[in-house]
């Protein structure tokens, strides 16, 4: 997360750290995710190397720091299923979204809980918040404590123009109607924030998941907002697959 601040532990209990086994056999944080319910997590498809080996990945919830996976608030979750959206193709992205089923249900409490998902297709506007353990500048260092930043949602037509022809060397130059763009100069999601939640909190304090971090250009680059998969466009696919 670029331009953000450290989140208060427990403020965002739906946040997930997705970790991948490295050559030493230990696990590194690679992506964020959001708890949808006790069995399912939503994340980005590009987090997983294909062909997928489920045992190479784990999810952690209730983390204060990605270094401290043994604290008593933490649940370490093995994965029983990884469902990539059928429209997703590696290195190209219309449908960079994936569901993870955990092997044992998540125990709900102060530090682990689901986030609401939109009921129908919505067109969010105004500001939204994105959180993650990703880098704090493009190619920069990763942080151990969860970061949060509030960013403006960019109107879709404007975003499509921004990522026009001249910029097609970026993977995400194809801005589809199933995407949301958000971000301002110096405030953005970044590498290793992928899959994490973009959400809005209403006057009653209820949070709704509106996007998952896809990619976008260099982090926090002034003219180019971050790109998110629009969750409300995928709720039918989600409910069909969360079985």
From Swiss-Prot:
Its main location: secreted. Glycans are attached at residue 127. The active site is at residues 46, 96, 194. SUPFAM superfamilies: Trypsin-like serine proteases (SSF50494). Keywords: Disulfide bond, Glycoprotein, Isomerase, Secreted. GO terms for cellular component: extracellular region. It is an enzyme of class 5 (isomerase). The keyword Lipid biosynthesis does not apply. Gene3D superfamilies: Trypsin-like serine proteases. GO terms for biological process: proteolysis. InterPro entries: Peptidase_S1_PA, Peptidase_S1_PA_chymotrypsin, Peptidase_S1A, Trypsin_dom, TRYPSIN_HIS. One of its GO terms (molecular function) is serine-type endopeptidase activity. Expressed by the venom gland. The keyword Metal-binding does not apply. Disulfide bonds join 31-47, 159-181, 190-219. It is found in: Secreted. N-linked glycan at Asn-127 consists of Man3-GlcNAc2-Fuc. Residues 1-243 form the Peptidase S1 domain. Its EC number is 5.-.-.-. It comes from the Eukaryota. Heterodimer with venom peptide isomerase light chain; disulfide-linked. Acts cofactor-independently. This is Venom peptide isomerase heavy chain. It comes from Agelenopsis aperta.
């Amino acid at each position: 997360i670029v331009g953000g601040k450290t989140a208060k532990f427990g403020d965002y209990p739906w946040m997930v750290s997705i970790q991948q086994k490295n050559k030493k056999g230990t696990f590194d944080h690679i992506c964020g995710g959001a708890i949808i319910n006790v069995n399912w997590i939503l994340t980005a498809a590009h987090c997983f190397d294909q062909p997928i080996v489920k045992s190479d990945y784990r999810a952690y919830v209730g983390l204060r720091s990605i270094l401290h996976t043994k604290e008593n608030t933490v649940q370490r979750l093995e994965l029983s299923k990884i469902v990539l959206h059928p429209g997703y193709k590696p290195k190209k992205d219309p449908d960079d979204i994936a569901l993870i089923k955990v092997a044992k249900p998540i125990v709900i409490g102060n530090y682990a809980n689901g986030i609401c998902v939109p009921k129908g297709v919505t067109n969010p506007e105004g500001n939204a918040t994105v959180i993650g353990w990703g880098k704090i500048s493009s190619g920069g260092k990763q942080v151990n404590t969860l970061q949060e930043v509030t960013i403006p949602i960019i109107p879709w037509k404007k975003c499509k123009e921004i990522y026009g022809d001249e910029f097609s060397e970026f993977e995400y130059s194809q801005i589809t109607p199933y995407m949301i763009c958000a971000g301002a100069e110096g405030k953005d999601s970044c590498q290793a924030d992928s899959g994490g939640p973009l959400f809005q909190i209403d006057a009653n304090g209820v949070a709704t998941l509106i996007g998952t971090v896809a990619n976008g250009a260099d982090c926090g680059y002034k003219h180019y907002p971050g790109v998110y998969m629009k969750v409300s466009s995928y709720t039918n696919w989600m409910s069909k697959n969360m079985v």
